[in-house]
Amino acid sequence: MIFQSFLLGNLVSLCMKIINSVVVVGLYYGFLTTFSIGPSYLFLLRALVMEEGTEKKVSATTGFITGQLMMFISIYYAPLHLALGRPHTITVLALPYLLFHFFWNNHKHFFDYGSTTRNSMRNLSIQCVFLNNLIFQLFNHFILPSSMLARLVNIYLFRCNSKILFVTSGFVGWLIGHIFFMKWLGLVLVWIRQNHSIRSNKYIRSNKYLVLELRNSMARIFSILLFITCVYYLGRIPSPILTKKLKEASKTEERVESEEEKDVEIETASEMKGTKQEQEGSTEEDPYPSPSLFSEEGWDPDKIDETEEIRVNGKDKIKDKFHSHLTETGYNTSNCPIYDYEDSYLNNNNTGNPENFKLQLLDKKNENKELFWFQQPLVSLLFDYNRWNRPFRYIKNNRFEQAVRTEMSQYFFDTCKSDGKQRISFTYPPSLSTFWKMIKRRIPLLSLQKRLPNELDNQWISTNKEKSTNLNKEFLNRLEVLDKESFSLDILETRTRLCNDDTKKEYVPKMYDPLLNGPYRGTIKKEFSPSIINNTSLENLKERVRINRIHTIFLPNTDYQEFEQKVDTVDKKPLSTEIDEFLTLINEFDNEPKSSLNLKDLSLFSDQEQGRVNSEKRTKFVKFVFNAIDPNGTTSEKKLIGIKEISKKIPRWSHKLITELEQQSGDYQEGVPLDHQIRSRKAKRVVIFTANNQNNDPNTKDTDTADQDQTKEVALIRYSQQPDFRRGIIKGSMRAQRRKTVIWKLFQANVHSPLFLERITPPLLFSFDISGLIKPIFRNWSGKEGEFKILESREEQTKREEKKEKDKKGENKRKEKARIEIAEAWDTIPFAQIIRGYMLITQSILRKYIVLPSLIIAKNLGRMLFLQLPEWSEDLQEWNREMHIKCTYNGVQLSETEFPKNWLKDGIQIKILFPFCLKPWHISKLYSSRGELMKKKKQKDDFCFLTVWGMEAELPFGSPRKRPSFFEPIFKELEKKIGKFKKKYFITLKVLKGKIKLFRRVSKETKKWLIKSSLFIKKMKKELSKVNPIVLFRFKEIDESNETKKEKDSLISNQIINEPFSQIESGNWPNSSLIESKMKDLTDRTSTIKNQIERITKEKKKVTPEIDISPNKSPNKTNNIKKFESPKNIFQILKRRNTRLIWKFHYFLKFFIQRLYIDLFLSIINIPRINTQLFLESTNKLIDKYISKNEINQKKIHFISTIKKSLYNISKKNSHIFFDLSYLSQAYVFYKLSQTQVINLSKLRSVLQYNRTSFFLKTKLKDYFRTLGIFHSELKHKKLQSYRINQWKNWLRRHYQYDLSQIRWSRLMPQKRRNRVNQSCMAQNRNLNKWNSYEKDQLIHYKKENDSELYSLSNQKDNFKKCYRYDLLAYKSINYENKNDSFICRLPFQVNKNLEISSNSNTSKHNLFYMLGNLHINNYLRKGNILYIERNLDRKYFDWKIIHFSLRQKEDIEAWVKSDTNSNPNTKIGINNYQIIDKIEKKGLFYLTIHQNPENNQKNSKNDFFDWMGMNEKILNRPILNLEFWLFPEFVPFYNVYKIKPWIIPSKLLLLNLNTNENVSQNKNKKQNFFLRSNKKIKNRIQEEKEPASQGEKERGSDIENKGNLGPVLSKHQNALKKDYTESDTKKGKKKKQYKSNTEAELDLFLKRYLLFQLRWNDALNQRMIENIKVYCLLLRLINPSKIAISSIQRREMSLDIMLIQKNLTLTELMKKGILIIEPIRLSVKNNGQFIMYQTIGISLVHKSKHQTNQRYPEQRYVDKKNFDEFILQPQTQRINTDKNHFDLLVPENILWSRRRRELRIRSFFNSLNWNGVDRNSVFCNENNVKNWSQFLDERKPLYKEKNELIKLKFFLWPNYRLEDLACMNRYWFDTNNGSRFSILRIHMYPRLKIN
């Protein structure tokens, strides 16, 4: 057995070795390359298919194989690779060859010299076949790019050690694949030839010569195929002659760019060659070995060695080098007399300025650019890497530099030492490698002998060990100090920061601190005012000048002496004003990436400031300080030589491209081609305003005035409404190759990115509403009509309204679409705009001067004919009023006479103001009532647009509107007159009718008398004949009533059907058959009743004689009984029964159908579900309706709430009959239970305490309820059942954060999930022993507030606590499996027993939150939760889902307010609270104001605790997406207030109106020195101001940290306000007094403070104001008045006070009156791309908070040392040393800061002795490495009850370490190349720590 296993193991290892061997891999990759079938296979197929003899076939295959062999060899052999891989050679070879081949195939007998049969090898055609196959095989990868498979061999060659073996095996693999392919092809061809069915095809038989023709034209077919493939491939990479060549940047291009250009050329040409050569170590000489001459480091002082070396080499060597370089890069050396320059350069060595030569070279290069195309060499014509052939984006950088080349490789391969081994690095600096080569050439090889690899290894290992031991020592020392219980923050390693001022303890702002990295690193903003420049910038300048001085010593300059004097003045005396001014000027350039100054720019600046400073001095100063201007004054610029930044040069395009729009608007800078290259969206620049400043001076030329006019134009850009297929494509690039705008249909109207295809709405066929179909059927068939009536009527009503609105919207959309289509059609058809323009103008003239006057004349003549007074004056007045205003194509008004610019090309609209409407008469008494209507109409339609056919349209290209008819009022008048005539006529008729009626009445009365008498006679006859039946009749009556009662009873007793069937049925029949059905029912019923009564009376007499039927006993009874007894009667009874059955069959059928329906249908569609659905829908719709109408009253709210309750009750009543529990969703049960009040839960006690399987609640749900604390504590089990579900899911389930609505999930950003987990940690972060020491703590905090120096430490500690919490959470969630000791896996309520008791005893009976509120509302509002608004954006809103309110109001709110855990249960809550809430309920408004003046506000703070936020708006005005809130409208105000700016509102202000009496006196004291700088706090705040405002926003989270004492709260807000005032002052350089009014200042402050708000008008704004704005806009010729007004207010262009009638309205009053509405902008505005990126990649809060340790001295967070433990989460089970005050660090590494932490981890992993080579990855193989970690925590005290338990100590990876580090480790250190191993990496990065 052992022997077998041994054999098996050997076999497996052998197999593995074979599989991993180079030969097998080579065979595999070679075989794969067979599948990349390129056009080269066409020739092979041609030779096989065309039967031209075996010789040709053989020659074709041999040619094919040799070609492939050459390709494989070229991969390995560098010279061959260069020959075939050089694009120039292939281009030169391929194009003529293809052309020649094409002609040769077309003219068959072109090369027939007569075949010599002696030796077939000499036959030219056979040789050609061989050559064709050979050459085409070589082309395959270059001019005709094939698929990726062909390149696999090249790629794998890099990783392989024995390369020759790999190449040969690869070729063999390809050969095998090729043989298989050829054999298969041969089989297919033989099958085609032999297949009878193909030959016997009808079509082939009818065309006898078809096969022959095919065979003859086979060559032609193949040549066509070849041509198509060539065209296809050239389509993918276009031929260089056909594509458009972009113009280079202008002649005066900066030298930097030209250098870069050369760089790129050198890189592209040399890259392929260089890499292979270096790897193989081939000794071939480099054709141009020093690209460093033209590389980025160029001629820096550091590179003197290189230049020296070149000088030593002498003239010849340099000539060769330069010559080779220029030929390489494609510049014709014959046109460039380089040698002379070189001679002069070498002869003038003593001058020592090598830049001269470089400049001359550049000039020559630019000259070359100017040459005509035929003067340029062929290669550079055919192949130019600068062509923009692929559709890349052109991403503009800034005005100094060109766009970055994305497709250029930025890698440079070379060998270097890494981890003690020689490895290939792809980011090796090219200059270094070339420098190394030069040294190798100069120094003898013996001295450069490599050391042995072992030496290297050993050295590296030893250094690494040394470093890691040092680190370990330091780490252990820190831990030991911690263990000695002397905790201080010095143990923690913190980040060093730059300090601005030691005395004031100010740091340099984060943004500018070079020692900090992260999102704060940024460029310093440009500032132009001289006052801002402080000492530091002067210091920088001095330093800069010193460096330049050093530079001039190295490169002596003629201006040196002057320069030195100038420097002395700079050093000795303060800068003169001119220099100071100049600095501000330079500043702008200084902050751009280092580049050159432009002389023209300077002259521009000097022109502007000519009055103050002499421009000559300035330019001199530039000359000396920056050495930037040539002494000769030429425009060729030099590089700014300043402090060299460590940066990598990026390959850039040599073009500066501009878009069409830029060309049209003239926004581009100088030195840019005038023609556009980027195709932007179809647009037209419409000039709407030109200010012609006519110049009276006769001396000025026309050109100047033209320029002036150009600058004074105001233009809009009008985009076409068509889909934009251009998307910024560059001219000459291939549109079909774009990735993101794919065209996948034959005809595609809109362009879509494939990413968003799912968003496109599917066709209507596939989407239909099933429930919508079922509902009406159910309603029509069920007998429940009565119950649905209320709901149905409302639902129908809302549906009808919705449908109307939908239809209206749809109609509007359709019209709009049609309008746009028409406009686009006019725009696209050539010459359409010209035709339309002329037509419009002719129509306008016709209308104004021909049609309307003629109509007026006709009308008035008609009036005169009808003997009416003519109305000439009125009509002419109206006609004069009509104005025809010329507008742009967009509809922007110009004037009556002024035509828009280029109107024939761009289009024109003609707007008719006060369009003339012909009326039959003007003022009449008849129309006095309609006067108002007409006025309204007039106001509405006082303008229209003229259409091409002379009609009027509401909008440009709209459908023509209906004009009021001229004859309509005339006809109406006629109708009225006819009506009057009719009235008179009818009066006469009435008189006649009255007389006729009298006659009729007399005749009727006589008739009646006759009938009565006849009836009387008949009656008498009947009475005499029949006496007995009368008694029976009486019986019948009584019986009938009894029977109906019975029937009714039976119906009532039936619970399922509440109404008689007949009634239901009749209700649903159509109207036509209604009367018939009723009649039928009636007759049926009466007859059955008769029969039944007869039957019952007789039967019962017979069978049961003892029962009396009637109360009156008749003497005839016995006779009757006798009658029944006879047999004849029995037969009659049977007969009657049959008839009765027949009669009853109708009802039986009905009943049966109903039964069927009830059993089948109702079991499927159960009533409770539908009831609830209807209920929810109807309430939602009702609420929607209220929202839309904007009418809300308290009554209505109450009404809704009552409806809610009543409807719920109804649904409960109805549903209990058909209660099928399986159809009730868990969510529904949960929802209902959560809605019920606490008291009602006692009814469910039995259900909840029922321990077996419960019917109503699933066990999961039950447990969930317990977790949430919905039940009373009595109902909770002491021990929960252990879950047997996956524990992780379980853990998630217990945290409410994961129970989110769809809307919430959609809003989540990448970080939000993490934040939710973090919040859950905070939820448990309370120790409740301190509950009663609340007030005492508050006082302590308050006292300690005054001396802030002590609290920098506590501030740090506070930060550290946060870090601790996150660590704890991470630790807990990972250790979830260990259930007994983990804290989070237990319920918070179990641990916090105190909380339960205290909350039950201290809060009121109606506890609104139940147990839940105690925890979760505080989770949102307590200390330390809202840490940084930047991080926790999702904390901006309350999560109302976790609060289950009841529908009560006052008491519940009181309870709610009280149940805040941090608040003292003894705190007094004043009556104000209720007043405010009532106010909100009654009026539906927020009464909230901004602090007008902080001083006044202190006094009134008690009253307007809800007011200071400045929101004033109707509740329903705000669109709230989530309709959940409308189920509880009472709480919307709270939500809205909090939503505005939660990180500013203290948590108490939101819910509590605190008692302020105790603190009033202190506040008064504070008030007095509020604006004095003596107050330390304010000092601190002012210090904070020095950090930028955005930073302030980030850090303002600290404001919410107050414990509830109103004193600090208020002062803090005053400080904040103060800060904002000062901020705005410093920013604008203004004082407060400069504001014209309070309103303006307030608005300014508001917009500054609440950056997330935008202003919006209310629609009902003052009419006069709108008109003024319209006038204002008409002057500017703009469209939308309200938008412009708002923007102008925000920009301070328009004053608020001018617009308002009342003076000095405050902002709140403005909002109260509804003039201004302030809307919150959604938070997404805040997150720019960089921030979101940082969210995903960056360091987490743990990290960040620790690095801010020393950052803000004056941060106002105070922690009492005694309460230090309070904030650390240490439950009783997990408390370690309850009496100690230090932290037990969960993650000991946190002592070190991040970079050192990383180093420690990595070093401890480098167990270097096990590393045998690059391919071996021992980190994952060797578990022993992990044990190194046990030493860190060897002597720690036990954290748990059981000792020696393993802590799985893992960090969350993403927050703590940056992605780049991870990727680097992943890729190079641990030798994994994809992301799939990240998980392995995680495990090994965070190993276990053992505790002894």
Curated annotation (Swiss-Prot):
TM ranges: 18-38, 64-84, 87-107, 124-144, 172-192, 221-241
UniProt entry tagged with the keyword Chloroplast: yes
Keyword annotations from UniProtKB, A to Z: Chloroplast, Membrane, Plastid, Plastid inner membrane, Protein transport, Transmembrane, Transmembrane helix, Transport
Signal peptide: none
CC annotations in GO: chloroplast inner membrane
Amino acid composition bias (Acidic residues), ranges on this chain: 256-268
Pfam families, per the entry: Ycf1 (PF05758)
Basic and acidic residues composition-biased segments: 1581-1602
Membrane topology: Multi-pass membrane protein
Location in or out of the cell: Plastid, Chloroplast inner membrane
Chief location category: plastid
Subunit relationships: Part of the Tic complex.
Function: Involved in protein precursor import into chloroplasts. May be part of an intermediate translocation complex acting as a protein-conducting channel at the inner envelope.
Family membership: Belongs to the TIC214 family.
Miscellaneous: There is a partial copy of the N-terminus (positions 1-337) of ycf1 in the inverted repeat (BAE48059).
Name of this chain's protein: Protein TIC 214
Biological source species: Nicotiana tomentosiformis (Tobacco)
